[in-house]
């Protein structure tokens, strides 16, 4: 909560707040660029440059954790809005295709599950969402937190599939799409060459593939079908981060229970666990780690 405020009338003590770390026009972030704001601080002072650009706002949700994972969820939202399709050859229609087929490759991690949750909430809902992984345990957990029955109630056919058990991944995945010819929107949630190439191969006509997972190798590349790019209007792009509007949308949808940010979280800890968790993060399996800064 906000503990105290200055003479301005925009904020009031006691309000829940959310904060966008990607400040427009600067590289510095409230993560670790400020001396009195960010990091693992129990209390902090928000400087003017964060407030004046609209990166601090209040929300009416009934929990605190939902705003704490608003940044990764806003990245997911940005990904959906970055995809586009073409109408009448020249008009770009932004967003995923309504009533189409979405494939979320490597989608049983925290970000992928956030993408599944968002697909069930958007106004231009797809008809089918196919989520892939190569780990049965992760696929089982994914179905526990976002079940195929829940998706059906929201008008979407959701299928979890282990591609490691497929003899012909391309053809078997295409067969799961609405018309059996491929996917209108493909999201690649792991920076693996083979997965990216698979995503390119399962695109339908006018399909759009989003390399959502950010590679750390600056020479990361993959073979793509440029014939399909020319004759079948396929598109490949990438998205990273999100903007203020994306984060506000996440906060609002979470408050209305339209999306489930909790699906991203697998570990919960207190302030005393911050140091060890941060130092050993690469060795801790699972999804997001929610660490409370309260005493």
Predicted segments — roles?
Residues 7-13, 75, 98, 205:
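Short, flexible surface segments
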Residues 14-18, 102, 209:
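Generic structural signal for buried aliphatic residues
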Residues 98-101, 105-108, 116-195:
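Adenosine-nucleotide cofactor-binding segment
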Residues 63, 74, 108-111, 193-194:
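Residue-level detector of alpha-helix initiation sites
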Residues 20-100:
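NAD(P)H dinucleotide-binding glycine-rich loop of Rossmann-like/cofactor-binding domains
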Residues 143-153, 190-256, 293-295:
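Glycine-rich phosphate-binding loop and adjacent beta-alpha segment
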Residues 87, 166-171, 194-201, 205, ...:
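C-terminal hydrophobic helical "lid"/dimerization subdomain
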Residues 1-23, 38, 50:
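Glycine-rich beta-strand-centered segment in the early N-terminal region that forms part
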């Amino acid at each position: 909560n906000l503990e105290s405020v200055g003479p301005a009338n925009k904020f009031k003590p006691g309000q829940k707040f959310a904060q966008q770390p990607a400040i427009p026009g600067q590289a510095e972030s409230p993560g670790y660029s400020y001396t009195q704001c960010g990091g693992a601080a129990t209390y902090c002072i928000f400087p003017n440059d964060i407030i004046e650009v609209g990166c601090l706002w209040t929300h009416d949700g009934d929990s605190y954790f939902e705003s704490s994972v608003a940044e990764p969820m806003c990245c997911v939202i940005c990904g959906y809005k970055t995809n586009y399709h073409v109408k009448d050859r020249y008009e770009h229609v932004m967003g995923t295709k309504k009533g189409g087929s979405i494939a979320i490759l490597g989608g049983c991690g925290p970000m992928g599950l956030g993408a599944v949750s968002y697909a069930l909430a958007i106004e231009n809902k797809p008809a089918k969402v196919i989520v892939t992984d190569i780990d049965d345990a992760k696929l089982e957990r994914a179905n526990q937190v976002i079940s195929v029955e829940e998706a059906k109630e929201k008008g979407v056919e959701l299928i979890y599939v282990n591609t490691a058990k497929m003899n012909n991944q391309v053809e078997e995945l295409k067969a799961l799409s609405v018309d059996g010819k491929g996917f209108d929107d493909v999201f690649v949630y792991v920076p693996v060459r083979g997965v990216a190439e698979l995503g390119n191969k399962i695109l339908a006509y006018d399909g759009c593939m989003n390399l959502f997972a950010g590679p750390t190798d600056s020479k990361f590349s993959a073979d793509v079908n440029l014939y399909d790019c020319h004759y079948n209007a396929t598109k490949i792009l990438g998205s990273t981060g999100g903007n203020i509007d994306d984060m506000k949308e996440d906060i609002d949808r979470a408050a209305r229970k339209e999306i489930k940010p909790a699906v991203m979280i697998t570990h919960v800890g207190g302030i005393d666990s911050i140091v060890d968790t941060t130092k050993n993060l690469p060795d801790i399996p699972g999804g997001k780690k929610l660490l409370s800064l309260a005493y």
